[in-house]
Amino acid sequence: MPGAVEGPRWKQAEDIRDIYDFRDVLGTGAFSEVILAEDKRTQKLVAIKCIAKKALEGKEGSMENEIAVLHKIKHPNIVALDDIYESGGHLYLIMQLVSGGELFDRIVEKGFYTERDASRLIFQVLDAVKYLHDLGIVHRDLKPENLLYYSLDEDSKIMISDFGLSKMEDPGSVLSTACGTPGYVAPEVLAQKPYSKAVDCWSIGVIAYILLCGYPPFYDENDAKLFEQILKAEYEFDSPYWDDISDSAKDFIRHLMEKDPEKRFTCEQALQHPWIAGDTALDKNIHQSVSEQIKKNFAKSKWKQAFNATAVVRHMRKLQLGTSQEGQGQTGSHGELLTPTAGGPAAGCCCRDCCVEPGSELPPAPPPSSRAMD
């Protein structure tokens, strides 16, 4: 691995298992595995991103970019890079573990959910993304699956994860690589035009839309038609799903989901909008409608997300049950670690004695089954 990345020197480790106990597979990527592990010295739980060097041939720049981005970030709503280890065949990124589960799961589990709850969530995302933008970092893949709760506490903060597609901007530069998740990418990305930080603001608008109704603003079984909708910024606030949502919330979304990136709100402008900074977000309970739509449109079997946050949640709940129950084998639904999905770790993952095979990424997630369901 070239050593051009800024930051502390990578620590050497012949066998990472001498330092950490591996507990579970949390996810797989194109050339990495994410493992739930425990520091043998401190008993602290962490997420370790294990990257096989042989899978990085020709991709060193991409990996170094991600590490460079992570090294610069210190924000309470962004998953932190704690340490880096290197062995002969692997690179290990020791990441802060977030154990509160996924955004959609928490909303569905709630008995009460309001516009104000959504506003507080979006405030945290905006504040974190503004911080990134001030550092010259564009995330480029903001979506609900990358928003995780820090802990199981009811008032837990939200955390932004997954910086695999993030990019450092040079002053005055524009980006041009088409990347991101189709339903959340800005029109200028699909149009293959040069783009900037404004793409993240568009994605936040899409997330806000979903948080208030439970379904995506753009949907079609045909990708070409889906892209056409996004390119034209054609979306609606459908009745009856939006009947109880404030005009202020809709105005906020319109400013973020603005087709013209020059007219689109920046994070700073969005943070000053009355729906975020003022008192216009309603307190009416919209849980039933939103949770029903989330369950219909974002079923777990369709997400196929690369990060198994459920495994972390179950592990944390197991710890909360206490050692006496564990000793009696009373695991129950909350006290049992998930087994690795799809029949076990991906072939060649770092929790075995070999390396990740190049290009062994998960298939892309299919679109939701319906844009809005009765």
UniProtKB/Swiss-Prot annotation:
Motif window: Nuclear export signal: 315-321
Stretches assigned to coiled coil: none
Keyword Cell cycle: yes
MF-aspect GO terms: ATP binding; calcium/calmodulin-dependent protein kinase activity; calmodulin binding; protein serine kinase activity
Location of this chain's protein in the cell: Cytoplasm; Nucleus
GO cellular component labels: cytoplasm; nucleus
Keyword Transmembrane helix tagged: no
Pfam families for this protein: Pkinase
Regulation: Activated by Ca(2+)/calmodulin. Binding of calmodulin results in conformational change that relieves intrasteric autoinhibition and allows phosphorylation of Thr-177 within the activation loop by CaMKK1 or CaMKK2. Phosphorylation of Thr-177 results in several fold increase in total activity. Unlike CaMK4, is unable to exhibit autonomous activity after Ca(2+)/calmodulin activation.
Region (Calmodulin-binding): 296-317
EC class (word): transferase
Tissue expression: Ubiquitous.
Modification after translation: Phosphorylated by CaMKK1 and CaMKK2 on Thr-177. Polybiquitinated by the E3 ubiquitin-protein ligase complex SCF(FBXL12), leading to proteasomal degradation.
Ranges of residues in domain Protein kinase: 20-276
Region of interest (Autoinhibitory domain), ranges: 276-316
Description of how the protein assembles with itself and partners: Monomer. Interacts with XPO1.
Family named by the database record: Belongs to the protein kinase superfamily. CAMK Ser/Thr protein kinase family. CaMK subfamily.
Described function: Calcium/calmodulin-dependent protein kinase that operates in the calcium-triggered CaMKK-CaMK1 signaling cascade and, upon calcium influx, regulates transcription activators activity, cell cycle, hormone production, cell differentiation, actin filament organization and neurite outgrowth. Recognizes the substrate consensus sequence [MVLIF]-x-R-x(2)-[ST]-x(3)-[MVLIF]. Regulates axonal extension and growth cone motility in hippocampal and cerebellar nerve cells.
Domains (record comment): The autoinhibitory domain overlaps with the calmodulin binding region and interacts in the inactive folded state with the catalytic domain as a pseudosubstrate.
UniProt protein name: Calcium/calmodulin-dependent protein kinase type 1
Organism listed in the record: Mus musculus
